[in-house]
Regions:
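Extracytoplasmic metal-acquisition and chelation regions
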Residues: 1-250
Length: 250
């Protein structure tokens, strides 16, 4: 949206590729970046709860990218202390990502009216790159999805997949024996050929289930960060997720 606009510098707060932001802690450099920022573009929907104190101390304008998006209830997980009411992983649906981009367009346009036309042109060019729905998703041999990350609800809904089970694993909060047995039972009942981990997360439990049931283990990408070069790397990552699903469940 900001490409080619003089005087606008975009920096990513969370630059590392991580599996989960639930327990992210702001670094000293993060705090400095927030203090210097004129505008903070946030995912919203509770994803950046870790920024509460920093936001209260900041004079920056805030653009909430989740405005206008119908949010799904957060998935509950045994033994996990996530207080978010709604699932914040809205960018995992390309239609929602376009709404997010539109929110950025309107937010920046209101703050910087002289460059509104440029923001509009950039947003339109980016939107034109979003591909049509992949027909392979309509003809999968197995439409059932089991993931080891709680962020694939929007992705599943957008692609006509039935998310049977989502296990959120992180340090100090591994899957329980009951959750593991539930996944084993589901794999056998629905004859599921593959289960999915997040590429920056642990595969240990999924591999154990694979040995027990014979199902394959594939990786999906939550795209928690990027290189700041525009929409194409995001679209490439989403396409790779689609290709992975088609290979694993097709």
């Amino acid at each position: 949206v900001t490409e080619g606009v003089d005087g606008v510098q975009v920096d990513l707060l969370v630059q590392e590729q991580i599996s989960c932001l639930h327990d992210y802690t702001l670094t000293v450099s993060d705090m400095r970046a927030i203090e210097k920022a004129d505008v903070l573009v946030m995912n919203g929907a509770g994803l950046e709860d870790f920024m509460g104190d920093a936001l209260a101390a900041s004079d920056a304008a805030v653009i909430d990218c989740s405005e206008g998006i119908e949010l799904l209830p957060a998935l509950g997980h045994e033994g996990h202390d996530h207080d978010t009411e709604y699932d914040p992983h809205i960018w995992m649906c390309e239609e929602s990502a376009l709404v997010m981009m539109n929110n950025i367009l309107h937010g920046l346009g209101a703050l910087d009216e002289k460059n509104l036309d440029c923001y509009r042109e950039n947003a339109a060019a980016a939107a034109a790159l979003v591909p049509e729905d992949d027909a392979r998703m309509e003809n999968l041999a197995c439409p059932y999805l089991i993931t080891f990350h709680d962020g694939f609800q929007y992705f599943a809904l957008d692609n006509g997949l039935n998310l049977l089970k989502s296990i959120e694993e992180e340090e100090g909060a591994e899957a329980s024996a009951a959750e593991i047995q539930e996944v084993v039972d589901l794999v056998r009942e629905y004859e599921i050929p593959a289960i999915f981990t997040e590429r920056n997360g642990s595969e240990a439990t999924a591999r154990a289930i694979s040995r027990e049931t014979g199902c394959a283990v594939y990786q999906l990408d939550m795209i928690m960060s990027g290189d700041g070069t525009g929409i194409q790397p995001y679209l490439d990552a989403m396409q790779k997720n689609i290709d992975t699903i088609a290979e694993a469940l097709g």
